Amino acid sequence: MKRVLLLLSFVFAALSTQAADYNILKYGAISDTTRLSTKAVQRAIDACAAAGGGRVVVPTGNYKIGSIFLKSNVHLYLERGATLYGSTKLEDYKPVKTDYVSFRTQQQTIQLIFADKVSNVTIDGYGTIDGRGRAFKKTAVTDEGITRPHLLRFIQSQDIIIRNITLRNSGCWMQHFLACDRIKIDGVTVYNRSTKNNDALDLDGCHDVVVTNLISDSDDDGITLKSTSPRLCENITISNCIVSTHCNAIKLGTETNGGFRNINISNIVVKPSYDQDETIFGRKSGISAISLEMVDGGVLENVNVNNIVVDGTESPIFIRLGNRARGYKEGLAVTNVGKIDGVRISNVRVRNAGPTGCSITGLPGYPVENIHLDNISIHHKGGVTAEAMPKIEESAADEREKSYPEATMWGVLPAKGFFVRHARNVKFTNIEIQTEQEDVRDNFVMIDVKE
């Protein structure tokens, strides 16, 4: 009898320590997209955090919110059939100014779901978060989204899980993780084609990240690694994803103040969007599948890309060392040219590409180094004639050191395969280039390339 009572006491103790659920309906949320439930959802989050953590449950229904703020040990769970809709009014979003210094934190920013200096946070379930981003338009050429709401934004946070949910229609970037550690993103579906700067995923100066089973369709870049502060993106693996984009499917850049180290990317399908009714930015078939850029003085090293299948894109592979030299805060000059050293790209199959070609380029005195490409098959439109070559070569002769890096920055390239300039120890193995139409260009054009 004593043993039974002792066992029961252990069971009750275990049950009492289980994290509780905090249903947003109990805190006043209403399934009605005409009425705000921001305060109710925030009350549930605050109560959960005050109790030491637990699960904030969004039940089946449609809920309208402005900015909400996640806290440590909170698990935001969206039931199947549950949707959190972002308000279409800017006044429903609370501007915040983090103390973390980066290019994108110099001003106040707004976001639908925000977290700064939190740990052990999960967002999952089988529901949807929809930012209704079409309500927020780009107001100026210099507007990079600071005045429009991000959907998810985490800064200086650790142990984050984003799993199984659907994310739609952000006013800016869909997911921005800045200076965060230990992130897992698994089974997330993204549709982000509402307005300008509609990236699918931005990892910015993050460490120890696993991204897997992501399916994304974005008007702007797909899976993007950035470095808008001196903190590198480091120790990141991305695998088993399907990416559709009008811009760059897998991109390291554009901001590269710190750089990228120990990046492994594998088993990626790049394909056109199912929905081609509108292109806000970029091209319907996409600009590039693999874009590795270093233009703001950082370092890019030990990057491995393997087993990529591409349907479309204008210029499948783009590796660029430039010197835009933009600092990560106002008044800070970048005085050094960056470095690209140690890239392997293997087992890439490309079909239906544009005629531009691929490029691997450094700058005079600053070569890209140790670039190995093997087992690459590219089939594209071709069609370049001898009459077109003088203009093509004239465009490519311009180094464009300070220009924004883009795979199409020179237009059609002098090579139908790879245009390589200012490079050391670049190795090609088993490269196949085929064109639909006759094309007079050589497969490879190399300028200032040495062992």
List where the protein language model places each region.
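Sec-dependent N-terminal signal peptides
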Residues: 4-13
